[in-house]
Amino acid sequence: MKIVIQRVSEASVAIEGEIVGAIQKGLLLLVGFGPEDGQEDVDYAVRKITQMRIFSDAEDKMNLSLLDIKGSILSISQFTLFANTKKGNRPAFTEAAKPEMASQLYEQFNQALSAFCPLERGVFGADMKVSLVNDGPVTIILDTKNR
């Protein structure tokens, strides 16, 4: 499971010109699943994302978590995080989980996160337009296989 975590002051996702999810201060997550990912990866990622101290405190130090600031999450499925660019000029996506499996894990992931904080989301497999204002910028890549 690979996740690009971006600290944002606002973010939204639109499908066919209609905004289907929007947040203010919080995290934009681009989430991809590999064929060996499972519930253990989901649990690990949820724990890390909700407890990671990447928001500034009163002294401008990154000491606060998403939960501390009562922030929100915008979750976007992103199979392209598993792109293989070793050969040629066109990325291969054979290292990504099959859509049926990835869709199920994405649902589990979002459901688990929503128990901790407000969550908005894109639509799995849809062509989406994501807008964000990156705060910092702070962008972190989490790979659940690198623990």
From Swiss-Prot:
One of its GO terms (molecular function) is Ser(Gly)-tRNA(Ala) hydrolase activity. It is found in: Cytoplasm. One of its GO terms (cellular component) is cytoplasm. It catalyses: glycyl-tRNA(Ala) + H2O = tRNA(Ala) + glycine + H(+); a D-aminoacyl-tRNA + H2O = a tRNA + a D-alpha-amino acid + H(+). It comes from the Bacteria. Transmembrane segments: none annotated. InterPro entries: Daa-tRNA_deacyls_DTD, DTD-like_sf. A motif (Gly-cisPro motif, important for rejection of L-amino acids) lies at residues 136-137. Keywords: Cytoplasm, Hydrolase, RNA-binding, tRNA-binding. Pfam families: Tyr_Deacylase. A Gly-cisPro motif from one monomer fits into the active site of the other monomer to allow specific chiral rejection of L-amino acids. An aminoacyl-tRNA editing enzyme that deacylates mischarged D-aminoacyl-tRNAs. Also deacylates mischarged glycyl-tRNA(Ala), protecting cells against glycine mischarging by AlaRS. Acts via tRNA-based rather than protein-based catalysis; rejects L-amino acids rather than detecting D-amino acids in the active site. By recycling D-aminoacyl-tRNA to D-amino acids and free tRNA molecules, this enzyme counteracts the toxicity associated with the formation of D-aminoacyl-tRNA entities in vivo and helps enforce protein L-homochirality. Homodimer. This is D-aminoacyl-tRNA deacylase. The gene is dtd.
